[in-house]
Amino acid sequence: MAKRTFSSLEAFLIFLLVMMTAITVALLTLLFVTSGTIENHKDSGNHWVSTTQGPTTTQSSPTTQTPTTQTPDLPPSQNFSGYYIGVGRADCTGQVSDINLMGYGKNGQNAQGLLTRLFSRAFILADPDGSNRMAFVSVELCMISQRLRLEVLKRLQSKYGSLYRRDNVILSATHTHSGPAGFFQYTLYILASEGFSNRTFQYIVSGIVKSIDIAHTNLKPGKVLINKGNVANVQINRSPSSYLQNPPSERARYSSDTDKEMVVLKLVDLNGEDLGLISWFAVHPVSMNNSNHLVNSDNMGYAAYLFEQEKNRGYLPGQGPFVAGFASSNLGDVSPNILGPHCVNTGESCDNDKSTCPSGGPSMCMASGPGQDMFESTHIIGRVIYQKAKELHASASQEVTGPVLTAHQWVNMTDVSVQLNATHTVKTCKAALGYSFAAGTIDGVSGLNITQGTTEGNLFWDTLRDQLLGKPSEEIIECQKPKPILIHTGELTKPHPWQPDIVDIQIVTLGSLAIAAIPGEFTTMSGRRLREAVKKEFALYGMKDMTVVIAGLSNVYTHYITTYEEYQAQRYEAASTIYGPHTLSAYIQLFRALAKAIATDTVANMSSGPEPPFFKNLIGSLIPNIADRAPIGKQFGDVLQPAKPEYRVGEVVEVVFVGANPKNSAENQTHQTFLTVEKYEDSVANWQIMHNDASWETRFYWHKGVLGLSNATIHWHIPDTALPGVYRIRYFGHNRKQELLKPAVILAFEGISSPFEIVTT
């Protein structure tokens, strides 16, 4: 074997990794020595700094939906064939500074402002007689953590008793890679988040619960209509060589290596008035790449924004009665970067199997979207998705009728025996991540010289792992083959387990529609196999012609799920299939059992399974809270760079203010926006809000200085729809004030730009 030499860059990266790992292990060891307790999900999770809510600014804006904590009875049963329908939407943005963005796993990709707010969108559907109901919640996050779900269910139980439960509530993430991290309890994700943020966790939980509260309050009789159609020109398979590992006979049944079908539910009241929309479609929200530092909802969020703005005329983004949820599906190997991978340094094509370049290696092989930049690519992909949903929504005519039925189990996914046939039984494995996990994907490469498709370990990395984390057992090595194990997460338990063992599996049916809530990212072919198996199981026991949709990234996150054949190639998705080569077969067996129980009315006979843990004393953020300071002679909100006197459509207004850390505002759930764009209306002699920070036309940048100093820069990209007139920009923030020997307080402030004019010539 030839002696391996390292470049100066690789040597530096290795040194950096060793130092970071040593520091991490030391911190974990310290925490484990001092704490490390486990509680069940009845724990509140509030073990950190109490939030101090300061006064908030009063803004003129359209009335927002207000939830109630009461549990009103449904109206007396009426003679209608539909469902009681309730929709609700609430802000769940969390921190937009001093926190990592979740998804790419790129060190240093921390939040530095806001492009759009993140929303939780809840849809409640109840039988006409009130006998059963379900709540489907699409949340603009990278994934749902087990801790989030347990805390949401706890709060719902305290408000509504047994009305909303683990079996009839689905929390599904859209999978934006531009949302905040910090809301996890398993060690691997805490390390990726650079600590647990109770501030963000509480904000997200409250937003999810509030969206359900609003939907619950708004329940009214209505109908559900379903439609399906294909979406073109928004997807590619980012691991086509893995897809080709699947049997030719199976691939021949499909016209594409991605699922192009969108399923849309149109929700209307008994008068036919629109209430909301749910769509499921498989594409990664990674049009915004890993150079981005602005919190946003990416392409699926832009589709939801366009739909809601069209239906909620006269309302600001995030407000209005109509709610549009663009939910994820089996997107595991599906990219929106449709121009495909190429070597960014030479323009050549990448090696298809390894996603690497002749010059520069894997870090040079990247895929790009259809736009001139990531913002334009997001708009292009999101608009196409919106337009197809709009078309399907307008033409939907097939009504969904039938009872609401639910089934749920907790399963130890590290110990599932799978009956492949009459003579062969296999098992899942303790969790582990393979080498190609560290390679990243063509949507977001890593900086390490590790390629996708790696099927053999490396002596250096194996030795480093063994010294820092201990050696993986022979059992896990054999079980995970042909995956070369980089991190044996299932055998690491200090200070808490590194990845989950206990996983939620869940099916909810609405008449002839079945929603399979999957706890991760199924690849295209994995999703097809699961849908087909569940549909056949329903048909076998009398529920024929079911439409099965996959709700991706639901309830708990367990990385990827490839087919057995794709697993052999060990590209990124396979290396991230943590429970081993038979993970998909295990899920198919488990979901078939749920389908059978629903179809045979035997759900009550099923075991609930082992309850997941709820950990206390998690590693907090390593970024301290420090007092904000304004420059000498200035106050928070003062203008440092004014707007120009005059602008035209298509230009960008830029105003710079004396700022404060925007994470302070995440401690105040009533904080609605960091900015407004306002137009002076002569007819009422007052300023009217035209845009807020949920608008895609605005951008809020936070520039961190030293010793508590910072600036806030607000951009308004003037749209074609802007009318001539006089405008201004307002900035809303909160500063942390710390006096000696006194607790910190959070104080609200605002800044106002000088007026400027939009002209036509």
Curated annotation (Swiss-Prot):
What residue intervals traverse the membrane?
12-32
The alphabetical list of record keywords is: Apoptosis, Calcium, Cell membrane, Disulfide bond, Glycoprotein, Golgi apparatus, Hydrolase, Lipid metabolism, Membrane, Metal-binding, Mitochondrion, Phosphoprotein, Secreted, Signal-anchor, Sphingolipid metabolism, Transmembrane, Transmembrane helix, Ubl conjugation, Zinc
According to the UniProt record, one GO cellular component term is: caveola
Listed disulfide bonds for this chain? 343-357, 350-365, 429-479
Question: Among its keywords, does the record have Chloroplast?
Answer: no
For this protein, what reaction is catalysed? an N-acylsphing-4-enine + H2O = sphing-4-enine + a fatty acid; N-hexadecanoylsphing-4-enine + H2O = sphing-4-enine + hexadecanoate; N-tetradecanoylsphing-4-enine + H2O = tetradecanoate + sphing-4-enine; N-(9Z-octadecenoyl)-sphing-4-enine + H2O = sphing-4-enine + (9Z)-octadecenoate
- For the site labelled Cleavage, the residues are 79-80
Pathway note = Lipid metabolism; sphingolipid metabolism
Q: Which residues are glycosylated?
A: 51-52, 56-58, 60-61, 63-64, 66, 68-69, 71, 198, 412, 449
Q: Where is this region: Required for correct folding and localization?
A: 751-761
Give EC number(s), comma-separated: 3.5.1.-, 3.5.1.23
Q: What does this protein do?
A: Plasma membrane ceramidase that hydrolyzes sphingolipid ceramides into sphingosine and free fatty acids at neutral pH. Ceramides, sphingosine, and its phosphorylated form sphingosine-1-phosphate are bioactive lipids that mediate cellular signaling pathways regulating several biological processes including cell proliferation, apoptosis and differentiation. Also catalyzes the reverse reaction allowing the synthesis of ceramides from fatty acids and sphingosine.
Stated name of the protein: Neutral ceramidase
Could you tell me which species this protein originates from?
Rattus norvegicus (Rat)
Q: What gene is it encoded by?
A: Asah2
